[in-house]
């Protein structure tokens, strides 16, 4: 059988922390920031963690 390949799009969007959790960036934080208030744009630049079944799916996609 051929090797399992990791999903390259998932590898670029998600990172695995040292404790094994999946970290992601928030959406809508890259452009049109002058329309969004300062509190919202600050919050959009913070990363967050995935939870539950989505985290299991992404971890499987990253490891290949």
Curated annotation (Swiss-Prot):
**Keyword set includes Ribonucleoprotein:** yes
Taxonomically, the superkingdom here is: Bacteria
Q: Which GO terms describe its cellular component?
A: cytosolic large ribosomal subunit
UniProt entry keywords in alphabetical sequence: Ribonucleoprotein, Ribosomal protein
Matching entries from PROSITE patterns are given as: RIBOSOMAL_L35 (PS00936)
| A GO molecular-function descriptor | structural constituent of ribosome
Q: Which GO terms describe its biological process?
A: translation
Query: Could you tell me which InterPro entries the record lists for this protein?
Result: Ribosomal_bL35, Ribosomal_bL35-like, Ribosomal_bL35_CS, Ribosomal_bL35_sf
Identify its protein family. Belongs to the bacterial ribosomal protein bL35 family.
Q: Which HAMAP family match?
A: Ribosomal_bL35
Q: What is this protein called?
A: Large ribosomal subunit protein bL35
Q: What is the lineage of its organism?
A: Bacteria, Pseudomonadati, Chlorobiota, Chlorobiia, Chlorobiales
